[in-house]
């Protein structure tokens, strides 16, 4: 059998279970004990949406690739971290996927946003074609920063989720910019100023009620992505404790990055090992039914997740957080400030109230959906793609 087309059900026996350790297991802001909560750990992992290489999907751009094997791993990791944001947005962090159990319409709406077809909001087709505007030809490998930029642009079309996506540049998170972005949605004077919305109104096959309802809110749910370089050719060990703390925060969406020959979606850690979902398995493309439902088992990792030493992590990563409310954001800021006081933990980025004077135009990349990455982005992350190699499967 072709190794590239094996499913995880086939390979289940090859994956190690969690080590018997007193060290806590952290999964996207949740703390577990291996001894007493192993089933809960596995259920949490299984409930994350898992996107892998696919084959035999409609040709990208009509005449392009019908599979992303060998080049799409970072794109799939980008889908996974963004799917976690949509799960938190529409289903909640504590939602769980149970095999064989009928899921809600919102669940299928989230999943359909990533299906391999051209009209899905965050499909491989949309990411690859939007990437052309970022200087990436279809089939070219992306780094974590580039996929973050592309997903931000695609999110502007997702009126159902109505997200504010902020990409923090220059290792700096500016609180004032984020508040301005998240509060810019409040355009109605009050509920009476906005038209009534029927619950079954659809936009591109998705319920639109959530997006319209949020126009009555003072805060637009925030997806915060922070591209970082934590060393030159290998991760600086001074950042390791800080990175671990990111997985402990309830706002955590995880990390996209990898090691020199592959990209992974990191969802937690135990001891000195990162826990991740691996996209390097080629599965047949899935076609949704007319009702919007689809066979979904292949989108959930049903075995103990992969692990790797933190020291093996490539230094070019993107860290993600989701703040549903302004209170969530304020709490995140408080945690980041406390983290700067932890002994032996070197801050990975700076949190400031206002834009430093040496910055150029205020938040050009975050307030202008159709702007390009701009020179300063390329200046800092120019080498990110060179540190990864395409897998030959």
From Swiss-Prot:
It is an enzyme of class 3 (hydrolase). The active site is at residues 73, 278, 280. It catalyses: [protein]-C-terminal L-amino acid-glycyl-phosphatidylethanolamide + H2O = [protein]-C-terminal L-amino acid-glycine + a 1,2-diacyl-sn-glycero-3-phosphoethanolamine; [protein]-C-terminal L-amino acid-glycyl-phosphatidylserine + H2O = [protein]-C-terminal L-amino acid-glycine + a 1,2-diacyl-sn-glycero-3-phospho-L-serine. Its EC number is 3.4.22.-. Belongs to the peptidase C54 family. The LIR motif (LC3-interacting region) is required for the interaction with ATG8 family proteins. Required for proteolytic activation and delipidation of ATG8 proteins. Cysteine protease that plays a key role in autophagy by mediating both proteolytic activation and delipidation of ATG8 family proteins. Required for canonical autophagy (macroautophagy), non-canonical autophagy as well as for mitophagy. The protease activity is required for proteolytic activation of ATG8 family proteins: cleaves the C-terminal amino acid of ATG8 proteins to reveal a C-terminal glycine. Exposure of the glycine at the C-terminus is essential for ATG8 proteins conjugation to phosphatidylethanolamine (PE) and insertion to membranes, which is necessary for autophagy. This is Cysteine protease ATG4B. It comes from Gallus gallus (Chicken). The gene is ATG4B.
